[in-house]
C-alpha cells in the first residue's frame, strides 16, 4: 500500500530522507530549506492584534481547509491557508513580530489577508508534536487534486510562554525595513536606508544616525588629513624640525612655521629664483647686475674627454668619478682588471631595458641638465693634474682682470652670532693674560705715519704764509734757512705725494725738465718777481 513500507511514517522518512521519526522532529530537508534564506519583515501596527489572535488559535484544535479551485494546499494549524500550485511550492511561516520567507525556484506566496497570525519556527524549538497526513495521488492529476497536507501543531503552553518572552527582547533595530523606535537606545549602529511606513509608495529614504554615534563623533567621512593629536605622545621617537621638540612632526607643530632658507646661499627671506648669489649655467659664476657671460651656451659645448654635450674637459664629471678606488692623497688609483658592463641594463629616463639613460633617444624628463656618461674612459696622471691646475689658475687671473670675480656675501645670522660669542670668549681670555693687549704692527705703523703727517703740516703752515705774504726783502741767511726747510719737508712727504711724483716721472721727458727748473727758480724768488714773470708773456703777446 505504501510502496513496500509498513507504515506511513516509514514511507515519509524514506521520501524525505529523514532517519529520525516524523513525530519527534520536523523534516530536516524542509528545515534546511526554510532557514537557508530568511528575510525579516514586520507590521508594527498589527503586532498587538496578532498576539491576541495567536493565543486563541493555540488553544483551538487543528483545522484543515481545502478549496476546490486550488491545486495544492498545505494547512498549518497556527497560520493561514497557503496555496501551492504545480509549478511552485511555497511554505510561509510567520512569527508575531516577523515573517520568514524561503524562496526557491518557481516560489510564490499567496497568503490570505484576513488571517495574518502565522505558525512560528522557534529557533530550533519548533514543535513537540507533528501530525502529517499524506493522501495517495491519483494517476491522472487534475487542477483540484491535493498532493500533501502538512499540519504542525504546538500543544505545549510552556513553549508558547518561552517564545513570547524571547520575542519581548527583540527590538525593531534587529529587523530590516522598520522605523526608528524610541526603545532603541541600547545600541550604537548606523542604520542606512530605513523607510517610513507612511511613505511606502514613495522612493524617499530617511537617513538617520544614532544620537550616541553623534556624541561619540563616529562618522564614515574620510578626513582630509591626519589627526592632529596622532603624534602627540611621549613614547614617539619623532623630532619636529620646526621647534626641535619630540613627540610630533613639523606639519602638526603648534608654533608658526619657520621661513624656508634658500638652497644656494642658506639665507632666509628669499628662495632660489630670487637669490643674489645665483650662478650662471654657462660659466658657473655668480649672476650679478653687471655680469656678462662670454662663454658658449651649454648645448654648444662638447667634452673632449667623454664626448658628451654640455661641458668642457676641465668640468667633466669623470674627474671626480675616477677617484672611486683612491683612499690616499695623490693621483687616482687604477683598477687592475677593467670592469665589464652588466647584463641587466635599464634606462632611468624611459624605464626600458637594453640601454642606459645617457643613450636614450626619448624626450628628457628634466631639460635643464644634460646627461652624462656613468663610465670612466681614462685615469689622470700627475702631469695631467698639473696641467689642469695651471689652466684653472690662468682662467682665474682672467676673471679677476675682467672684474667678474665673485664677491663675498654676508654670512647667515647663525654664523655671525657664533662668531660674536667666540670673539667675546677670546677677549675674556686675553684680558686675563695681559691687562693691556698689544696692538698689531700694521696699526702701529699707521698711527706713526699719521702723527708724522700732522707734524709736517704744522711745520709747513708758517712757511706757506711767508711765501704768500712776503714782508719786504729778507737777508740771505733767512732765505737760505727758508730754502732748507722745504727741502726737508719734501723728503719727509707722505706716501700720497710719492705716488704723485711717480706718475709725473712716467710722463714725457720734455715736460719734466721745464717743471723742475720752474720749481727751483720759484723757490728762491719772492712773490713780486713771480707775478712779474706771469705778466711778461702777456705783454710780449701784444
UniProtKB/Swiss-Prot annotation:
The modification Phosphoserine is found at residues 142, 478, 480. Residues 112-126 have a biased composition (Polar residues). A zinc finger (CCHC-type) spans 238-255, 260-277, 301-318, 345-362. InterPro entries: TRAMP_AT-DNA-binding, Znf_CCHC, Znf_CCHC_sf. Residues 422-435, 531-542 have a biased composition (Basic residues). It comes from Rattus norvegicus. PROSITE patterns: ZF_CCHC (PS50158). Residues 110-144, 396-542 are annotated as: Disordered. GO terms for molecular function: RNA binding; zinc ion binding. There is a cross-link at residues 129, 136, 236, 251, 336, 410, 432, 474, 485, 488, 531 (Glycyl lysine isopeptide (Lys-Gly) (interchain with G-Cter in SUMO2)). It is found in: Nucleus, Nucleolus. Residues 474-489 have a biased composition (Low complexity). Keywords: Isopeptide bond, Metal-binding, Nucleus, Phosphoprotein, Repeat, Ubl conjugation, Zinc, Zinc-finger. GO terms for biological process: nuclear mRNA surveillance of mRNA 3'-end processing; nuclear polyadenylation-dependent CUT catabolic process; nuclear polyadenylation-dependent rRNA catabolic process; nuclear polyadenylation-dependent snoRNA catabolic process; nuclear polyadenylation-dependent snRNA catabolic process; TRAMP-dependent tRNA surveillance pathway. Component of a nucleolar TRAMP-like complex, an ATP-dependent exosome regulatory complex consisting of a helicase (MTREX), an oligadenylate polymerase (TENT4B or TENT4A), and a substrate specific RNA-binding factor (ZCCHC7 or ZCCHC8). Several TRAMP-like complexes exist with specific compositions and are associated with nuclear, or nucleolar RNA exosomes. This is Zinc finger CCHC domain-containing protein 7. It holds the Pfam family zf-CCHC. Residues 412-421, 436-456, 499-510, 518-528 have a biased composition (Basic and acidic residues). The gene is Zcchc7. GO terms for cellular component: nucleolus; TRAMP complex. The keyword Repeat applies. SMART domains: ZnF_C2HC.
Amino acid at each position: 500500500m505504501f510502496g513496500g513500507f509498513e507504515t506511513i511514517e516509514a514511507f515519509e522518512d524514506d521520501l524525505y530522507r529523514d532517519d529520525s521519526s516524523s513525530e519527534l522532529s520536523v523534516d530536516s530537508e524542509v528545515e534546511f530549506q526554510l532557514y537557508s534564506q530568511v528575510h525579516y519583515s514586520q507590521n508594527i501596527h498589527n503586532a498587538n492584534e496578532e498576539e491576541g489572535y495567536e493565543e486563541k488559535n493555540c488553544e483551538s484544535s487543528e483545522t484543515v481547509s481545502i478549496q476546490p479551485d486550488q491545486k495544492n494546499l498545505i494547512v498549518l494549524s497556527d497560520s493561514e491557508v497557503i496555496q501551492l500550485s504545480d509549478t511552485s511550492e511555497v511554505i510561509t511561516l510567520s512569527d508575531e513580530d516577523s515573517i520568514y520567507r524561503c524562496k526557491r525556484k518557481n516560489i510564490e506566496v499567496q497568503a490570505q489577508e484576513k488571517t495574518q497570525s502565522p505558525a512560528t519556527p522557534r529557533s530550533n524549538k519548533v514543535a513537540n508534536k507533528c501530525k502529517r497526513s499524506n493522501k495517495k495521488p491519483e494517476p491522472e492529476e487534475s487542477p483540484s487534486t491535493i498532493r500533501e497536507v502538512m499540519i504542525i501543531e504546538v500543544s505545549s503552553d510552556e513553549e508558547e510562554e518561552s517564545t513570547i518572552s524571547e520575542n519581548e527582547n527583540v527590538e525593531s533595530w534587529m529587523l530590516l525595513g522598520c522605523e526608528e523606535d524610541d526603545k532603541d537606545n541600547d545600541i550604537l549602529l548606523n542604520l542606512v536606508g530605513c523607510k517610513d511606513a507612511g511613505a511606502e509608495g514613495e522612493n524617499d529614504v530617511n537617513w538617520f544616525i544614532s544620537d550616541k554615534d553623534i556624541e561619540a563623533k563616529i562618522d564614515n567621512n574620510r578626513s582630509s588629513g591626519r589627526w592632529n593629536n596622532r603624534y602627540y605622545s611621549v613614547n614617539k621617537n619623532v623630532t619636529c624640525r620646526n621647534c626641535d621638540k619630540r613627540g610630533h612632526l613639523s606639519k602638526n607643530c603648534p608654533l608658526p612655521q619657520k621661513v624656508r632658507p634658500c638652497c644656494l646661499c642658506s639665507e632666509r627671506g628669499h628662495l632660489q629664483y630670487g637669490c643674489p648669489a645665483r650662478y650662471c649655467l654657462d660659466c658657473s659664476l655668480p649672476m650679478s647686475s653687471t655680469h656678462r657671460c662670454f662663454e658658449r651656451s651649454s648645448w654648444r659645448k662638447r667634452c673632449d674627454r667623454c664626448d658628451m654635450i654640455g661641458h668642457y674637459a676641465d668640468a667633466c664629471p669623470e674627474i671626480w668619478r675616477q677617484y672611486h678606488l683612491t683612499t690616499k692623497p695623490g693621483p687616482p688609483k687604477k683598477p687592475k682588471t677593467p670592469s665589464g658592463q652588466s647584463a641587466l641594463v635599464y634606462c632611468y629616463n624611459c624605464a626600458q631595458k637594453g640601454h642606459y639613460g645617457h643613450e636614450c633617444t626619448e624626450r628628457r624628463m628634466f631639460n635643464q641638465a644634460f646627461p652624462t656618461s656613468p663610465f670612466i674612459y681614462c685615469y689622470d696622471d700627475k702631469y695631467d693634474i698639473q696641467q689642469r691646475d695651471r689652466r684653472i689658475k690662468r682662467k682665474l687671473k682672467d676673471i679677476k682682470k675682467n672684474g667678474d670675480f665673485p664677491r663675498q656675501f654676508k654670512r647667515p645670522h647663525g654664523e655671525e652670532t657664533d662668531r660674536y660669542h667666540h670673539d667675546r670668549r677670546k677677549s675674556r681670555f686675553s684680558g686675563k693674560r695681559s691687562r693691556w693687549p698689544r696692538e698689531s704692527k700694521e696699526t702701529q705703523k699707521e698711527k706713526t705715519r699719521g702723527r708724522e703727517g700732522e707734524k709736517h703740516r704744522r711745520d709747513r703752515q708758517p712757511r706757506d704764509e711767508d711765501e704768500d705774504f712776503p714782508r719786504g726783502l729778507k737777508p740771505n741767511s733767512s732765505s737760505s734757512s727758508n730754502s732748507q726747510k722745504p727741502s726737508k719737508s719734501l723728503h719727509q712727504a707722505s706716501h700720497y705725494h710719492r705716488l704723485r711724483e711717480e706718475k709725473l716721472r712716467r710722463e714725457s721727458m720734455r715736460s719734466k725738465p721745464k717743471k723742475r727748473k720752474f720749481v727751483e727758480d720759484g723757490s728762491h724768488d719772492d712773490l713780486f718777481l713771480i707775478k712779474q714773470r706771469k705778466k711778461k708773456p702777456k705783454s710780449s703777446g701784444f
